[in-house]
Amino acid sequence: MAALSSGSSAEGASLFNGDMEPEPPPPVLGACYAGSGGGDPAIPEEVWNIKQMIKLTQEHIEALLDKFGGEHNPPSIYLEAYEEYTSKLDALQQREQQLLESMGNGTDFSVSSSASTDTVASSSSSSLSVAPSSLSVYQNPTDMSRNNPKSPQKPIVRVFLPNKQRTVVPARCGVTVRDSLKKALMMRGLIPECCAVYRIQDGEKKPIGWDTDISWLTGEELHVEVLENVPLTTHNFVRKTFFTLAFCDFCRKLLFQGFRCQTCGYKFHQRCSTEVPLMCVNYDQLDLLFVSKFFEHHPISQEETTLGETTPASGSYPSVPPSDSVGPPILPSPSPSKSIPIPQPFRPADEDHRNQFGQRDRSSSAPNVHINTIEPVNIDDLIRDQGVRGEGAPLNQLMRCLRKYQSRTPSPLLHSVPSEIVFDFEPGPVFRGSTAGLSATPPASLPGSLTNVKALQKSPGPQRERKSSSSSEDRNRMKTLGRRDSSDDWEIPDGQITVGQRIGSGSFGTVYKGKWHGDVAVKMLNVTAPTPQQLQAFKNEVGVLRKTRHVNILLFMGYSTKPQLAIVTQWCEGSSLYHHLHIIETKFEMIKLIDIARQTAQGMDYLHAKSIIHRDLKSNNIFLHEDLTVKIGDFGLATVKSRWSGSHQFEQLSGSILWMAPEVIRMQDKNPYSFQSDVYAFGIVLYELMTGQLPYSNINNRDQIIFMVGRGYLSPDLSKVRSNCPKAMKRLMAECLKKKRDERPLFPQILASIELLARSLPKIHRSASEPSLNRAGFQTEDFSLYACASPKTPIQAGGYGEFAAFK
């Protein structure tokens, strides 16, 4: 501010009050004025002085904006100076306009008008002291050579925001109203989609579009108001001590003592209070508003409805949503480089990198689990990108999960080649791709990996000589012994399984109840006459499935290849979650529903830790024992869930459309299935649990659902959840159902959030009352001898046994 007010105020006042002789205007300007009419000859000098004052005032305003315009809470002296400069600028411009109009009409000025000019110039110069060096710059302006002088437009637009706030934005040509106000709205916790903007014209508010060029509105006042249907409230902050692990929603640092909004759940440190969004927006209902507004202006025609009948994998599916769509299209992110095997989505850009190893014939020992397994990622990028979303997503839980990955991987296969896969059994060369015939020969050790490891190579090399194999005796003994844990040991010969009644059919096969050393479930897969490549790929996937052992996973017991491919799993006494929720409509208590969600997340976390993508998670594949123990089935098996052409494997749209993620429906990527696509399906399962309904129940057209979900126009209606559903569960559901794949959390975070929610629920403990003493081992005869009545129990005569004193 000191720089802005530098210079001698006395000099500025004397200059514009006539004490000093001003420099005459340029000849061109004087000639123009002289020819414009027969007015006062002193008018051109007065116009000249006013123009200099306007320029200086505008420079002061621009300097203020450059200095303090980007601050959220600018100092009060800045606001006072800004208001003073803008008011003086308005007065000067009005006076200049009057002078120019009078010159054009040839009228003469009265004494009062010249007096007012002196007053304006004097008041302006008294507050805007101008240095002599600054005046010398503007005494020879270049823009005064125009034949028709016009009033300069105002470079700013005043905007009145919700909650009695206001701001000023520069009016730049080519910049829309949305871009100009985006930062101001974001600082107040708002987005343009939930607001409407109006201009004041003739005393009335007239709506304008967000894409209007703001330079057309120079000098006008805009009013931004929140839409009526948007549930906008103010925060309800309370001070809170977080005894469980929590993180600040702004700085993402550990939070012990801070504040929390009771309405939206936003939590923060006291030092971060200035960065908290000013508005408390219910974004769940906001999504419904966007969908309803879209269909008001874009009704779906019959042609668009039939568009979903085309096969998404063929490339005919629309790929880029229109500008009115809720979210932008999902773009692949760069491939990470570190070697912790945490799941990330497949990226088509890696295919060229894999091809540098060359094309060779497929090895019979190479595991073909490339579709269900994911390359390693950078831990720092994972933590930074995923963050800690919502309550109960602690950072140490994620690090604990990473340690599980290291401890569960005894085989030496941790290296940094993007095309490698981590398994729990001792494999041959490891592949990842969508076609057979690709092979990789990873180096023995690479910098940047956690450990220097050795990997088996297909081609001859020094690493094959790690053990002497020169003697034929050793080779014969190895051939005789073989591998103890071979996948061939899990093949059940034809005729040992007794197939019973048909239970049901799904997308990839038919399930029967069978007998094989007890009750088992036999799933006959829809693969007729498998090729040798398919058969070997199927066996390789079984090599991964046979390692799954978890309380919430259906136990894999074996497989058979004759008369057709079949998977044998344990028999689950009970019904599927779909049958409970939608057929017999079992009424579960909320604590039971949360426990079912916790067990499902626990089982999926285990599968993802094994680098297995479910690909078809839904309530039909979640089974409940009689004690409500969750068992997840029908996981993995990319060989069966893909389309084969000869020896090559291709992706196809598989699964049930209600549980499909938008990127899976679009099928734009070569392999759209990822851990995040399983998370989306889990979000739909949460929706079923918390509403008791299937999503999109109001739409009967299957193709319409495929089209709208794939384009991002449709999402489940979260307003239908039960009234007693915790807010944390509703927020978790919304996170899992994000339209952008990379914005969804992973199952370690989901499991931690649900466990924290389950611990925070109020539980009614049984009181240590008299009936509990009976259960502790006392007999009724023991109480017949003593007076054990409650103080409120009326005493009856003869109720005290055989004591003579009471008779």
From Swiss-Prot:
Q: How is it modified after translation?
A: Phosphorylated.
Top-rank taxon, per record = Eukaryota
Give the keywords, sorted: Allosteric enzyme, ATP-binding, Cell membrane, Cytoplasm, Kinase, Membrane, Metal-binding, Nucleotide-binding, Nucleus, Phosphoprotein, Proto-oncogene, Serine/threonine-protein kinase, Transferase, Zinc, Zinc-finger
Q: Where does it live in the cell?
A: Nucleus; Cytoplasm; Cell membrane
Q: Where is the Protein kinase domain?
A: 497-757
Disulfide bonds listed in the record: none
Look up the coiled coil feature and give its residue ranges. none
The record describes how the cofactor is bound as: Binds 2 Zn(2+) ions per subunit.
Q: Which residues bind Zn(2+) 1?
A: H235, C261, C264, C280
Major site of localization recorded for this protein: nucleus
Regulation of its activity: In quiescent cells, maintained in an inactive state via an intramolecular interaction between the protein kinase and N-terminal domains. Following mitogen-mediated cell activation, binds via its RGB domain to active HRAS (GTP-bound) which releases the inhibitory intramolecular interaction between the two domains. This allows the MAP2K1-mediated dimerization of KSR1 or KSR2, and BRAF which activates BRAF.
Positions binding ATP in this chain are I503, G504, S505, G506, S507, F508, G509, T510, V511, K523
Chain positions covered by the region annotation Disordered: 1-36, 104-128, 303-372, 434-494
Q: Catalytic center at which residues?
A: D616 (proton acceptor)
What residue spans carry the Low complexity bias annotation?
A: 1-15, 110-128, 314-328
Which Gene Ontology molecular-function terms are recorded? Answer: ATP binding; calcium ion binding; identical protein binding; MAP kinase kinase activity; MAP kinase kinase kinase activity; protein serine kinase activity; scaffold protein binding; zinc ion binding
Q: Which GO terms describe its biological process?
A: CD4-positive or CD8-positive, alpha-beta T cell lineage commitment; CD4-positive, alpha-beta T cell differentiation; cellular response to calcium ion; cellular response to xenobiotic stimulus; endothelial cell apoptotic process; epidermal growth factor receptor signaling pathway; ERK1 and ERK2 cascade; establishment of protein localization to membrane
Cofactor names: Zn(2+)
- A Pfam match is PK_Tyr_Ser-Thr
| Family membership | Belongs to the protein kinase superfamily. TKL Ser/Thr protein kinase family. RAF subfamily.
Q: What does this protein do?
A: Protein kinase involved in the activation of the MAP signaling cascade. May play a role in transducing specific signals in neural cells.
- Protein name (record): Serine/threonine-protein kinase B-raf
Q: Which organism is it from?
A: Coturnix japonica (Japanese quail)
Record lineage? Eukaryota, Metazoa, Chordata, Craniata, Vertebrata
